[in-house]
Amino acid sequence: AHHTGLPYGRVDVGYLLDHAALDAAGRLAFRAKALRAAEHLLLCRYFDYCQVVYQADVVGFEWLLEDVVQYVLEQGTWRNLDKDSVYEMVAKGQWAAIDDMCLMAKISELRGDMGTPPHVQEKSKAIIDRHPPVLLGSAERIGQLRDGWLSDTKTGLDAMVDDLTRKLRIDRAFWKVWTRGQPWASVGGKTEEKQDRRWITILRSDVASERIQEAPGSIMSVLGDRQLDMLRVYLLPPASTCDVEEARRFIDDYLNSRLGSA
């Protein structure tokens, strides 16, 4: 939010830094005076995710890039990019050669290489031509933190896409079921251990602290056990396939039924 200029104000980073401290466990925390500024940071970050990071075309292109880069790595174009290999390439002055231009040149080669699998060819072409995949359907809801709705709905979507794959005779590699659960009160983290370290913490005294959603009177005390559940189904139609409306209808009906039962 501080850098994108999105219309919900600027985070007072300086004020937050002025009130940063360590709690008894040595974790970064903010003094109670900075509670509202910290909540503003979380709200801005939440909307930043929704409007920028999780924007529909951005997510679609990320899927294409991930799949194409994975294919390039599997073909041995570059060595395994583990830590030791990267250190070795840096030492030999080779790492600088693997940049955006190098990757785009490789993707351009894949687009015209008849030995490339069709789905990789199509994805490479879409990246070069800047044509995002088709968004067949999407759903969002604010629900309880990790209540199972997201995973259950994804399971149903995966089964439906498998059926549509057979019915429409479009390879499964052209489809993507994308999900994300974005908590309001957290700044990220995938595992419980990492998640615990990444909660914003507020000092109650000189050393004692509590997570921001436990602070009395905080907005996050209401939103702390909530998350935004997001689901999307993408399709990159092969060149020979144009009609995707049948798939769109099936997916919309399913997602609407799931939202109605939430």
Residue ranges and their predicted role:
Residues 1-262:
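Histidine-centered, transition-metal-coordinating active-site segments
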